Curated annotation (Swiss-Prot):
Annotated Basic residues bias: 228-241
Compositionally skewed regions (Basic and acidic residues) per UniProt: 88-99, 131-142
Molecular function GO terms recorded: nuclear estrogen receptor binding; nuclear glucocorticoid receptor binding; nuclear retinoic acid receptor binding; nuclear retinoid X receptor binding; nuclear thyroid hormone receptor binding; peroxisome proliferator activated receptor binding; protein domain specific binding; transcription coactivator activity
Gene name, Swiss-Prot/TrEMBL: Tacc1
The protein's assembly and partners: Interacts with CH-TOG and YEATS4. Interacts with the AURKA and AURKB and AURKC. Interacts with LSM7, TDRD7 and SNRPG. Interacts with GCN5L2 and PCAF. Interacts with the thyroid hormone receptors THRB and THRA, predominantly with isoform alpha-2. The interaction with THRA isoform alpha-1 and THRB is decreased in the presence of thyroid hormone T3. Interacts with RARA in the nucleus. Also interacts with other nuclear receptors, including ESR1, NR3C1, PPARG and RXRA, preferentially in the absence of their hormonal ligands.
Positions where N-acetylalanine occurs in the chain: A2
GO cellular component, one term: nucleus
Any Pfam family: TACC_C
Protein name (database record): Transforming acidic coiled-coil-containing protein 1
Entry keyword annotation includes Cell division: yes
Coiled coil: 579-774
């Protein structure tokens, strides 16, 4: 298996690469954010640092530093797509102060001869209320970090006809016309305090104001020198530092204003117009209802025709949150000396409800007068209680105004750009005559921001590319569309709240590269839409400039302030040429992004192969480890069983040994008894031996005595036998003698018997003879 740099990295390098991928380019912006450290920022950074410890399941295996990573981080790519964000961020304090003085000089030159009527109405108020500005500041600087995007309500007030274009430009961009000899007591301290953070945010506003003044013929040549310094737009997450100024100026500063009443002075000077959208949506609904009467009154006095079916006061959706909570937050005082957090994600409160796109304007003149009265700066309650006192002098000025032409509006749906190429993305829609350029984008961003939070991720929401010709507010309106597109892209990056595998990291970076390439294609179509919008608005500007007695041009909240600027043919041609050049540039940039995407895609595929091999190796290692663990578990179980058996045997042996010991003790006692018996038996044996010896002695004595007696008996027997033989011989001789006698008698008997028989026979014969004779 081939090794790659991914497999031989240290944990420190991996942590650095993961940190850079999560933070993007936000690290440098945090360092330039201000000299003071915010506790909330420190907590957020600590939370992000902690979340990095759970960023991957293979942190200890391989690391990839920023320089060796073949895939760019998602946030950096989205940020690099707008070259205006890639410029240096730090700016010396002297250049900031010079910019502030330059803006003040430009305003003084543009307004000393053109603001006489408004100065007469409002100069006493400025002198009276300029002192309490510092007193009100403590309670006015409440936490309005939630208000990150404000859109100016385009009502330009022209107090005279000397230089209406320059004054209209200043009014459109929110610049404050100042009387000769009058300083800016409210904007300068606030700008000085928040300048380290607001510098890039206010660059677009100042540049737009100065260039529009130059093009319209105003005597303002000085701002050209500082344009390179001012072209440093800052992401929305860091623009929120300039939010404490609007409320302070609205509550405590009664300076004369030619800007929109819904856009305070501090916000007009410091906020980027590319994100100043939907400020009316951030006010309470009561203000809209009250101000409707003032506006309708002024319109009826001056003869302005208002179409009852087309609401001209439609406002864009808030990009961060719904406006229902803004009024409550504005009433809460902010702790002094503390800046709002520059993190976008932690400071946004999500509500599932978005503001309505438009607010219908009533046709009643009294209602319109009340509307203009409510849109004026917040003054003391005694002055606000008199509706006829219009601080803009709208009653006498609007009397000769010509009827308003139907306002051009375009329905721009970024979700349907690439689906239908044949359709015109900038087709005018009569149903949305007064809506903003990107209401769908606002709703889309609201849906993104209303989604549940996960880990804290740094979202860079400023995707607009600020050029020299983008002083026109129409281009800045299109920037808000780019903002929504960038938010929708960046929000799809997976949040790193837990363990993220290496494949997820690669997939997230590749998807971001694809979306950044698609953003270039969308930018071309957006430029085409902007071109058509500029042409139509230029026609409206010519129609309004044709009337010499039209000091006021009322534009709806969804349209650009370009209607109040009188453009010449040369200016329009130059603008169109610049737009065409920008379209070509965007096409080239899109092609470059496509090439970068293909290269990155090849690298991602290669890395996926490497990761697949790595996963196979890891799987094999895990398999071997599992087998080893199984065998070790089996052997361990066997050893455990053997151990248990040995323990059982040991217990039985111990029991046997204890029994043997007891038996041994018993046998020991028995043996002692045997020894005692042996001794007794030995004694008995000795006694028996002694007795046997005694008996032997007695036997010997008896034997000798018996032998003597036997000898005597034998002698007596011999004597008896000799005597018996002599007696038997005598008896035999007497027997023979007797036998001879018997034999002699028997023979004598036999002779007698024979003689008897012979005599008997002689007698029988004689008797027989005698009986015969008888």
């Amino acid at each position: 298996m081939a090794f790659s740099p991914w497999q031989i990295l240290s944990p420190v390098q991996w942590a650095k690469w993961t940190w850079s991928a999560v933070r993007g380019s936000g690290a440098g912006e945090d360092e330039a954010g201000g000299p003071e450290g915010d506790p909330e920022e420190e907590e957020d950074s600590q939370a992000e640092t902690k979340s990095l410890s759970f960023s991957s399941d293979s942190e200890g295996n391989f690391e990839t530093p920023e320089a060796e990573t073949p895939i760019r981080s998602p946030l950096k790519e989205s940020c690099d797509s707008s070259p205006g964000l890639a410029e240096p961020e730090a700016k010396p304090q002297e250049s900031r102060e010079a910019d502030e003085q330059l803006v003040a000089e430009v305003i003084e030159k543009c307004s000393p001869d053109t603001c006489s009527r408004s100065s007469e109405n409002e100069a006493p108020q400025a002198t009276v209320d300029s002192h309490p500005v510092k007193d009100v500041r403590g309670k006015a600087e409440h936490d309005v970090s939630k208000i990150s995007v404000v859109r100016p309500f385009s009502i330009e007030t022209r107090n005279c006809t000397d230089d209406p274009a320059a004054l209209g430009t200043a009014a459109a961009h929110g610049c404050v016309p100042v009387l000769p000899g009058m300083a800016l007591p409210s904007t300068t301290p606030e700008a000085t305090q928040d300048e380290p953070v607001m510098d890039r945010g206010m660059g677009v506003t100042l540049e737009a104001f100065t260039e529009a003044s130059l093009k319209t013929g105003g005597p303002c040549p000085e701002p050209v020198a500082s344009r390179s310094k001012l072209r440093k737009p800052k992401p929305v997450s860091l623009r929120k530092k300039m939010a404490p100024e609007p409320e302070m100026l609205m509550e405590g500063s009664p300076l004369p204003k030619a800007s929109s009443p819904w856009l305070p002075d501090g916000l007009d000077q410091n906020a980027n117009p590319s994100v100043l959208r939907g400020s009316g949506a951030q006010r309470s609904p009561l203000n809209l209802k009250e101000t409707a009467g003032v506006l309708s009154n002024d319109t009826s006095d001056s003869g302005v025709e208002v179409a009852p079916g087309s609401p001209p006061l439609q406002l864009e959706d808030d990009f961060t949150e719904d406006g229902e909570n803004v009024k409550i937050r504005s009433a809460l005082p902010k702790q002094s000396g503390r800046k709002p957090s520059n993190k976008l994600a932690p400071s946004i409160r999500k509500d599932g409800v978005s503001k309505p796109v438009g607010v219908e304007q009533p046709s009643d003149p009294t209602v319109q007068d009340a509307l203009l009265d409510q849109m004026s700066p917040k003054l003391d309650p005694s002055k606000r209680s008199h509706p006829p006192a219009n601080f803009f002098g709208s009653g006498p000025i609007l009397q000769n105004s010509p009827p308003l032409s139907s306002k051009c509006s375009h329905h721009f749906d970024p979700n349907n750009i690439n689906t239908d190429d044949s359709g015109d993305p900038c087709k005018p829609t009569p149903a949305l005559t007064s809506s903003g350029f990107c209401p769908a984008t606002g709703n889309h961003v609201n849906e993104i921001l209303d989604s549940p939070k996960k880990a804290k991720s740094r979202l860079i929401t400023s995707g607009c590319k600020v050029k020299k010709y983008e002083a026109q507010p129409l281009d800045l309106d299109a920037c808000s569309q780019d903002e929504g597109a960038v938010i929708s892209k960046i929000s799809e990056i997976p949040n790193r709240d837990g363990h993220a595998t290496d494949e997820e990291k690669l997939a997230s970076t590749s998807s971001c590269a694809q979306k950044s390439a698609g953003a270039g294609v969308k930018g071309i179509e957006k430029e085409t839409c902007q071109k058509m919008e500029k042409e139509e608005l230029a026609v409206h500007g010519l129609l309004e400039s044709s009337s010499e007695k039209a000091p006021v041009s009322v534009a709806c909240g969804g349209e650009s302030p370009l209607d109040g600027i009188c453009l010449s043919e040369a200016d329009k041609t130059a603008v169109l040429t610049l737009i065409r050049e920008e379209i070509i540039t965007k096409e080239i940039e899109a092609n470059e992004w496509k090439k970068k995407y293909e290269e990155t895609r090849e690298e991602v595929l290669e890395m996926r192969k490497i990761v697949a091999e790595y996963e196979k190796t890891i799987a094999q290692m895990i398999e071997d480890e599992q087998r080893t663990s199984m065998s070790s578990q089996k052997s361990f179980q066997q050893l455990t069983m053997e151990k248990e058996q040995a323990l059982a045997d040991l217990n039985s042996v111990e029991r046997s040994l204890s029994d043997l010991f007891r038996r041994y003790e018993n046998l020991k006692g028995v043996l002692e008894g045997f020894k005692k018996n042996e001794e007794a038996l030995k004694k008995c044996a000795q006694d028996y031996l002694a007795r046997v010896k005694q008996e032997e002695q007695r036997y010997q004595a008896l034997k000798v005595h018996a032998e003597e007696k036997l000898d005597r008996a034998n002698e007596e027997i011999a004597q008896v036998r000799s005597k018996a033989k002599a007696e038997s011989a005598a008896l035999h001789a007497g027997l023979r003698k007797e036998q001879m006698k018997v034999e002699s008698l028997e023979r004598a008997l036999q002779q007698k018997n024979q003689e008897i028989e012979e005599l008997t026979k002689i007698c029988d014969e004689l008797i027989a003879k005698l009986g015969k004779t008888d």
